Amino acid sequence: MKTLSQAQSKTSSQQFSFTGNSSANVIIGNQKLTINDVARVARNGTLVSLTNNTDILQGIQASCDYINNAVESGEPIYGVTSGFGGMANVAISREQASELQTNLVWFLKTGAGNKLPLADVRAAMLLRANSHMRGASGIRLELIKRMEIFLNAGVTPYVYEFGSIGASGDLVPLSYITGSLIGLDPSFKVDFNGKEMDAPTALRQLNLSPLTLLPKEGLAMMNGTSVMTGIAANCVYDTQILTAIAMGVHALDIQALNGTNQSFHPFIHNSKPHPGQLWAADQMISLLANSQLVRDELDGKHDYRDHELIQDRYSLRCLPQYLGPIVDGISQIAKQIEIEINSVTDNPLIDVDNQASYHGGNFLGQYVGMGMDHLRYYIGLLAKHLDVQIALLASPEFSNGLPPSLLGNRERKVNMGLKGLQICGNSIMPLLTFYGNSIADRFPTHAEQFNQNINSQGYTSATLARRSVDIFQNYVAIALMFGVQAVDLRTYKKTGHYDARACLSPATERLYSAVRHVVGQKPTSDRPYIWNDNEQGLDEHIARISADIAAGGVIVQAVQDILPCLH
């Protein structure tokens, strides 16, 4: 097994291992792909196979034949027998038709900034192949198969974070994939199972020869939304995981704050039956079931709480109403991204049944742009909610008797508890809400001679979403650390020992134990998670927890009961 290099990217949530496991191939061409399919290929190196369905393969060839006939007859078709964009009034001869496609790669090779994570580029190749298998693009099966070969061999072109306005698709990013697939020039670089090399060398190692693009093929490869959609699919997948973990954190916090389960009673939420609200309430009932730390008041009875409020504060009591629209929103985004995953997004499109071609705009990434704007907004709301819970836990005035800043050893007077950890979290949360600002509605770019005179900024929105997801991953790690320390301290207050496993609900005990395992601390009865400040570096714990989440490790496995509903 070889691990594909992440040297070109700082985004930890995009790590993946190339396993080459063929037992559950993802088939391209005869079935719709899901976000989970994209994650399997992009992250885990699951092998892909082009369908051998005869009708589909014949349709691909028929679209190529249509283009060839159009070139031979001189029929005016955009980007085939004409120039591009604002120069589409330039007629291209039969002799120049192939050169036009190769030149397209060259003049679009203008990317800048950091390299994209490998997993996002792998997702893009998968989606480009999936789009072309519809037989409406006029591209050879041989070129589509190159993407299958690259994916299965762990060969990933380097693509850059700047270059696309999401108008005519991801022209600049896809030029790097195209140039690498055909071995156009040594300046096109790839990652070959962790080793950087130029594209022609990679082709030789794969026993492949350089390809010359035929008419329409360059445009078909570069004129589409596959890169922004690949990034978006990975971001939605990550956000679903982080939402599930956040639900687990809230369940830990409710137990640590000695909260009630009454606020999640079905009677309340059936009276306001938004799907996300119903889901959140039902999940919280399950997450808190059989806990010894929660107030079990599902019978509708109420008890006075000494000097505390008779009902929980809003961040606990209104959890379903707050999280419900976020869950619904993420679900809607996922549906839109899956439609985009299974769409044909280049131009023109070829209708082989009616021997016609149509000039259109499926390359405009507006659904992706707006979807990723909304996803970042929802991530900011998720962080805001967790931040409020952390503030309750850290403040003895509101924590129902927990020590200030969740101090462990109060006899050591210099201990400050999780004060620094909260400050770090406070530095992250505003940034996440800032990233929640939209970009699809901003900065109109009257690009390319006013041909691309409206754009989606879908690619930029998606890359911002990637950044937001990676930052939120660190914030969730901090929230988990607060939750684990808090339930240890609540357990001590209730039982006289610190091992929260004895008191937690079974569902949250799994999450608690997973975090303890990841940070390398077994629970004990005589000490909570954090005892003295100088006995561990909490920055290392943040990094370990974040890395485990990124790798789909034991923390993610601990919330598997929640994930199917979100996926």
UniProtKB/Swiss-Prot annotation:
Q: Where is this cross-link: 5-imidazolinone (Ala-Gly)?
A: 167-169
Q: Which pathway does it serve? A: Phenylpropanoid metabolism; trans-cinnamate biosynthesis; trans-cinnamate from L-phenylalanine: step 1/1
- Provide a GO CC annotation, any one: cytoplasm
Swiss-Prot/TrEMBL GO biological process terms: aromatic amino acid metabolic process; cinnamic acid biosynthetic process; L-phenylalanine catabolic process; phenylpropanoid biosynthetic process; protein homotetramerization
Q: What is the effect of changing residue 108 to A?
A: Slightly decreases catalytic rate
Location(s) in or outside the cell: Cytoplasm
Q: Give a yes or no for keyword Secreted in this entry.
A: no
User: Is Lyase tagged as a keyword?
Assistant: yes
PANTHER family under this entry?
Answer: HISTIDINE AMMONIA-LYASE
- What is the official name of this protein in its record? Phenylalanine ammonia-lyase
Biological source species: Trichormus variabilis (strain ATCC 29413 / PCC 7937) (Anabaena variabilis)
